[in-house]
């Protein structure tokens, strides 16, 4: 199996554009004006509760890094506390309870259709990976837990990509793998014909537990695609030549449905100018640098902080020194191995956190960082800002990306842009 870390390291040895040495683009696309807006929807199959330690555990595994033992134990501790809280509430009130799923913004997904006739699945658009994979009719039934599946045999336009397979290894040694088909793939009216669709033969238990997700649409660079013997182009790379502009944008929201735009930049979604910064091409991720940070009303600390803008990662992971400086200003905050990260009394007042993109500044509201309660009855909250120690890379996840209107530009060389936008109340 190939891990994302293996691909990251190997790609550092290749000082070329991320689009070289890849198969030709598909040129049969229904562009419908060359632009499309994709609105997220709230998936009714969301979990009854969100385990924040599991979010950190998944981030380690996603990037091919073994998670520390204390994080594994923290997942179990929080699961146990949540189940005890649910049982206690049901016993006391006679009805089940849950942390409202929209409190943690994990149930928002994008509907797509695959094949002829179209099969609808709910997928996550993920700038931190480059595989378009789905639960399928080939996935063992004991690895499917409520997900919708893609059945290639029910599509008249599906074709097996003979001899091609895909395989991803995660940091705990588990993995997902499968076979590859080409089929019509449509998001929001934008159709790519003969898009590579990676049908799962095996899915890790981590992904089986994600009942709200039927798979991923990777929007990283195609150089990171794990199909072998020949890497396949991502949906965006297949669509790029037929879009009005070679861009897609992310307008993620706090406790609300966000949207993605392909092929254009909607000026109504942001204010002022878009500040662009260079993408470090060789890794294949949307890797770039922040220009510094500040905590609350403190002075801005100029510092180059390299990391990945990843819409598929929930939290914001930064160097330990920065995270420590932040939580030093939160009464009662502690770096808890029991809970797998920084926690604090839910009643504590949190400061804002500001990050820089070149000369522009973006302030994350304190409410975004007061991420979630440990359980429905807990008075302890988990922070949306956590240390990247052990990961080997900083991750600018949704907690940060919700603060800005973000432009992913597929120009050569690629670049990423951030703009101020109105925030949800």
From Swiss-Prot:
Residues spanning the signal sequence: 1-28
InterPro entries: Aspartic_peptidase_A1, Aspartic_peptidase_AS, Aspergillopepsin-like_cat_dom, PEPTIDASE_A1, Peptidase_aspartic_dom_sf
Annotated Gene3D superfamilies: Acid Proteases
Listed Pfam families: Asp
Cleaved propeptide residues: 29-91
Entry EC number(s): 3.4.23.-
Domain of life according to the entry: Eukaryota
Family matches, as PANTHER family: ASPERGILLOPEPSIN-1-RELATED, BETA-SITE APP-CLEAVING ENZYME, ISOFORM A-RELATED
UniProt record similarity statement: Belongs to the peptidase A1 family.
Protein name from the UniProt record: Podosporapepsin
Organism: Podospora anserina
Gene: PAPA
